[in-house]
């Protein structure tokens, strides 16, 4: 097999593995949401809030692609479950921001702990240099996914 074919096969394998990982990730988060009594979109929206910090419902709608009405219902559910709070924006009292509260929820940490521990165990199989390369690759792949997400939203 020539280097070109070998490289091409490796690239195809990368695409297949990322598809597999993406599918397993979606299925895992669906199961996690169900275990928490949430819809998958609710759980991922709470995750977006944890990652990005407090934001308005409109900003959350832009990030998720959900309509205003859907975001309102989603925030209502998350607030009722104790995963977010609506607070007045300290910089503009006319605005309300959605504040994540999930980081302090022990049962969420407990739910994700085995996955975190398994991931850390996997990391221990690689050298620091290998991990830096892996993280660079995965980070760039995440950037590509973000770009493709934005493209699909247009």
Swiss-Prot record:
Annotated ranges, domain HTH marR-type: 7-143
UniProt DNA-binding region: 57-80
SUPFAM superfamilies linked: Winged helix' DNA-binding domain (SSF46785)
Any one Gene Ontology BP term: response to stress
Keywords: DNA-binding, Transcription, Transcription regulation
Cited InterPro entries: ArsR-like_HTH, HTH_MarR-typ, MarR/SlyA-like, WH-like_DNA-bd_sf, WH_DNA-bd_sf
Gene Ontology molecular functions: DNA binding; DNA-binding transcription factor activity
Coiled-coil ranges per UniProt: none
Keyword Lipid metabolism: no
Highest taxon in the source lineage: Bacteria
PROSITE patterns membership: HTH_MARR_2 (PS50995)
A Pfam family matched in the record: MarR
Protein's name according to its UniProt entry: Uncharacterized HTH-type transcriptional regulator YcgE
Origin species: Bacillus subtilis (strain 168)
């Amino acid at each position: 097999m020539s280097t070109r074919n070998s490289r091409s096969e490796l690239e195809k394998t990368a695409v297949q593995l990322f598809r597999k990982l993406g599918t397993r990730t979606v299925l895992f988060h669906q199961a996690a949401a169900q275990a928490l009594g949430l819809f998958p979109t609710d759980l991922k929206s709470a995750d977006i809030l944890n990652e990005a910090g407090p934001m308005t419902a409109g900003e959350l709608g832009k990030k998720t692609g959900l309509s205003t009405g859907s975001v309102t219902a989603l925030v209502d559910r998350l607030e009722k479950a104790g995963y977010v709070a609506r607070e007045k924006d300290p910089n503009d009292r006319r605005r309300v921001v959605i504040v994540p509260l999930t980081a302090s929820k022990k049962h969420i940490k407990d739910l994700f702990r085995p996955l975190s521990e398994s991931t850390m165990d996997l990391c221990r199989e690689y050298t620091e240099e290998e991990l830096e390369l892996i993280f660079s690759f995965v980070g760039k792949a995440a950037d590509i996914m973000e770009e493709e997400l934005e493209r699909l939203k247009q």
